[in-house]
Amino acid sequence: MKATLRTRLDGFQERFEELAALLAEPDVIADQARFRDYSREYAELEPLIEAWRSYRRTEDDLEAAEQMREDSDPEMRELAEEEWREAQARLEALDADVKRLLVPRDPDDASNVFLEIRAGTGGDEAALFAGDLFRMYSRYAEKVGWRIEVINASHGEQGGYKELIARVRGDNVYARLKFESGAHRVQRVPATESQGRIHTSACTVAVMAEASAVGEVELNSNDLRVDTFRSSGAGGQHVNTTDSAIRITHLPSGLVVECQEERSQHKNRAKAMALLAARLKQSAVDAQRQQQADTRRSLVGSGDRSERIRTYNFPQGRITDHRINLTLYKLGDVMAGELGEVIDPLIHEYQAEQLSALQAS
């Protein structure tokens, strides 16, 4: 392990021990705000420090076994050789654990998200693919125990969606889905294609962390215009005789959100406000990432919806993620919800990228 990482880890251990002492002080215990903040920091550091301490102990075990390998007794040397191999294997595993835990956690990783899917180039075929993508995400959500609900949907004429917005709730949703933002391209033969020609169409996906607290995004009522209208279903027919659907316009930014999935105007308004807060938060994040993109590549992207990230080739059963040159011939499995096959390599690459930046700093 590099000396720079060791120095950083020793610093974290000193802070961890300092926090343990602070949490035992009566004046800190009496101050709920300080006690809560210190407890949170302590809990965040604890897994890293435990792994680092285990790493240091295993280094000592390895050194002891190394010395025993020089023993004059053949049986002792054989025993030492076995202990050395075991210690070496443990050290390699702990090295990976420490580095993984050292990567700074995105503060939004534990957040729920709003998932937007929009049909792009390709007309009806793009809308059908938007429906396929939503089913893929829904099946993945079911597999990992998340809950998904549609906030707003505009149906395609031949099926699928022109646009769909869903809220996804569960453990570490943003941590798993944040790499999905961008342009998703599909190559396949449409059902209406009599010549068997492959068509290319695309959808854009945006993943926005839900604002976790009311005060995280400031929404001034004077900056909002709220309109009501009747909900409509597929084909434009009205499905509700009351003006329960809500459209909110954020006047300073021009952002517009709608929600019409609930029969209650109150519920639609609450969901629309949550979506607006998430979009405003995402706008600020995108601006920050755009600045970062000028200096380094980021797998999360700059927030540009046109950034092509993935191709789904149905004739070949192939899915390719262009950011990490990942190609899998498991398209059927991925579309059936085995999205972890793509997400996990992206997370590993992102963590390696973050660790490299840490080592260079």
Swiss-Prot record:
Q: What is the name of the protein in this document?
A: Peptide chain release factor 1
What SUPFAM superfamilies does this protein's entry cite?
Release factor
Cellular compartment(s): Cytoplasm
Which positions carry N5-methylglutamine? Q237
Give the taxonomic lineage as stored in the record: Bacteria, Pseudomonadati, Pseudomonadota, Gammaproteobacteria, Oceanospirillales
Function statement: Peptide chain release factor 1 directs the termination of translation in response to the peptide chain termination codons UAG and UAA.
A Pfam family (short name) is PCRF
Highest taxon of source: Bacteria
Question: Which key words are in the record?
Answer: Cytoplasm, Methylation, Protein biosynthesis
On whether Membrane is a keyword of this UniProt record, the answer is no
- Which NCBIfam families is this protein grouped with? prfA, PRK00591.1
User: What is known about its processing and modification?
Assistant: Methylated by PrmC. Methylation increases the termination efficiency of RF1.
What family does this belong to? Belongs to the prokaryotic/mitochondrial release factor family.
One GO MF annotation is: translation release factor activity, codon specific
